[in-house]
């Protein structure tokens, strides 16, 4: 094997892109923070799915599972977008824990209405972070990442809506 081939194989993972080095670094950083938040939100949503209890068990259990599936589904898209623009992704649980902004909930019991409120708040925080990342992508003219983020914002807004409506208290007749 010649020397050039050996050197290329040792080179850092840097997918060719027309984005500048600063744009690639900043967008990859923003996406990795989002990826950490998405993993944290996924695990919290799944935890609440496993531990929900009470008269609305079935409805909340199913909703949390659907939302967790939707959240997990974007992890690969986020990570692959980082790679497409020449960055590297989070590598470990420890790396995720250092980057995540969505707090964990290690409580043994959480009231179902508190679960709804906490997940709603976490999804709203995710939306804020997504909008900030979108602004960065707009500044750097990364329309592909911005386009993906728009879909993720819409999905998170839908989750917030469902969590909000599930927590509303109707009158005694159910209306």
Annotate each predicted stretch with a short phrase.
Residues 18-26, 41-66, 132-144:
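Helix-loop segments that flank and shape redox-cofactor active sites
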Residues 52, 57, 69, 93-97, ...:
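Long, contiguous binding/interaction regions
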Residues 52, 56-95:
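Conserved alpha-helical segments that form or flank metal/cofactor-binding pockets of metalloenzymes
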Residues 1-17:
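Acidic, low-complexity proline/glycine-rich segments
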Residues 32, 36-39, 65, 69-76, ...:
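Generic structural signal for well-ordered, non-transmembrane alpha-helical segments
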Residues 12-34, 112:
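Disorder-to-helix initiation segments
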Residues 73, 147-173:
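Short, contiguous alpha-helical
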Residues 81, 94-151:
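Acidic/histidine-rich alpha-helical segments that form the ligand environment
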